[in-house]
Amino acid sequence: MNLEHMGKAAQEAAFELATVATAQKNQALAIIADELEANKDAILAANAKDINAARESGMTDALIDRLLLNEERLTGIANDVRNVISLNDPVGAELDSRVLENGMRLSRRRVPLGVVGVIYEARPNVTIDIAALCLKTGNASILRGGRETFHSNVELVKVIQVALKKADLPAASVQYIEKPDRELVSQLLRLDQYVDMIIPRGGAGLHKMCKENSTIPVIIGGFGISHIYVDHSADISRSIDVVENAKAQRPSACNALDTLLVSEKVAETFLPRLAERLNKSNVEFVADDAAYSFLEGKAATLRHAADGDFDTEWLSFTLGVKVVADVAEAIAHMRKHNASHSDAILTNDIQSAERFVNAAGSAAVYVNASTRFTDGAQFGLGAEVAVSTQKLHARGPMGLEELTSYKWVGQADYLVRP
C-alpha cells in the first residue's frame, strides 16, 4: 500500500470536490444511507467477526459495546447521514464583507480544508460519520481505523465507494488504509505535501503519538477526564438522575462521567443515595477517604482511590468520587486532573454556576445537565468527526463548519494599487 499515491489521489479528489454542487454531494450521502440499509446483512456479518475476535482477546463488555453494530444502530447511522443532507452546506458561505475606500468589495468565504486524515480506534460508525461530513464540506478523507473493527470498516468503505461511483464523484474522495501496520500511521503523519489536517480519535496514547510525530496540524480531542460537581445547593434527587445518566447510560463514551466531586455540605446525604441507585448498574466506586466513609456499607463495590485514579478516563462502570469543600476546590481539582472535555455543575446557586462556567477549562461546560450531551447530533450539528479539546481552530464537537477554513475574496473594477 503506497500512501504517497493515496495522498496524491486524495489531493486531486479534493480539488474536484471543492467545486462540486451541494446537490451532487447530497446525492452521494443519500446513496450511502440507502446502501447501509440495503447491505445490512453483510455489514453485520463482518461486525460479528470483529466482536468474536474482541471477546477472544478478553476485551471488556464496555469496550466491546463500542465495536458493536446491530440493526438498530445501523439504521441510526443511516439516519445520521440523512440528517447531514438536511444541514446547510457551509462551503461558499460568506462570513462577512465590506467595501474598502478604494471601491474593492472584500469578503471572507468558507472553503474546504482539503484532505483530512483521520486515525481512529473502535467505533465503526466513525467511518461513516467522517466520510459523510467530509463529503458534505468538499473535503477528501484518508481513514485509518483500528484493527479491532477491521472487517466492519472494510464493508462500510465498500458502501461508500458504491455511493461515490453512483454519484459520479472521485473514488479517492474517501480512501481507507486497510493494512493495520503502525508504520503506515507514521507515514500518514508525514504526508504534509498532500494532507491538510490530522484528526486522531482514541486514547491518550494515540493523541500523544500523533502530536509528537506529525508534520501536519493535528486536532487533539476525544480524551479528557469528565467531571460533575454537586454543589451544596443542588437538588439531591434530580442530581442523582443526572449522575446516573452521565455514568451508566453508555460508560464507554468519551463524554461519560469519570470523576464525581461532591460538596462536603451534602456528601453525607447524597453519596449513600447515589450508591443505592448506581448499585443497580454495578458501578464500582473509587473514593477518596472522605467519600469512602460515606459510601462504606452502601456501595456494593468500593475501593480506596490510588495514585492516578483521578487521572483515569474509565470508559467502564467505574466512578472516581471525591469530597471537596466548595466550587473553588472542585475547579482546582479539575485543573489538576485534565478537565478538557466535558464538565458540569449541579447547583441552584447562580453565583456558583457562573463561577464554574467561567473558570472551567473544558471544551463543553454544563449547568444542571449531563456531560453526555457533548455530541454533534445532540448539538444539532449532525454527526461529528471528533470532539476537539484544544483551543485553536475548533473546540468541542466538530461538525460541518469546523471542517472548513476561509479565503479572502476581493472584487473590484480592474483596480490597481497606487
UniProtKB/Swiss-Prot annotation:
One of its GO terms (biological process) is L-proline biosynthetic process. Catalyzes the NADPH-dependent reduction of L-glutamate 5-phosphate into L-glutamate 5-semialdehyde and phosphate. The product spontaneously undergoes cyclization to form 1-pyrroline-5-carboxylate. Pfam families: Aldedh. PROSITE patterns: PROA (PS01223). Its main location: cytoplasm. It is found in: Cytoplasm. Its EC number is 1.2.1.41. Belongs to the gamma-glutamyl phosphate reductase family. This is Gamma-glutamyl phosphate reductase. InterPro entries: Ald_DH/histidinol_DH, Ald_DH_C, Ald_DH_N, Aldehyde_DH_dom, G-glutamylP_reductase_CS, Glu-5-SA_DH, GPR_dom. Keywords: Amino-acid biosynthesis, Cytoplasm, NADP, Oxidoreductase, Proline biosynthesis. Pathway: Amino-acid biosynthesis; L-proline biosynthesis; L-glutamate 5-semialdehyde from L-glutamate: step 2/2. GO terms for cellular component: cytoplasm. GO terms for molecular function: glutamate-5-semialdehyde dehydrogenase activity; NADP binding. It catalyses: L-glutamate 5-semialdehyde + phosphate + NADP(+) = L-glutamyl 5-phosphate + NADPH + H(+). PANTHER family: DELTA-1-PYRROLINE-5-CARBOXYLATE SYNTHASE, GLUTAMATE SEMIALDEHYDE DEHYDROGENASE.
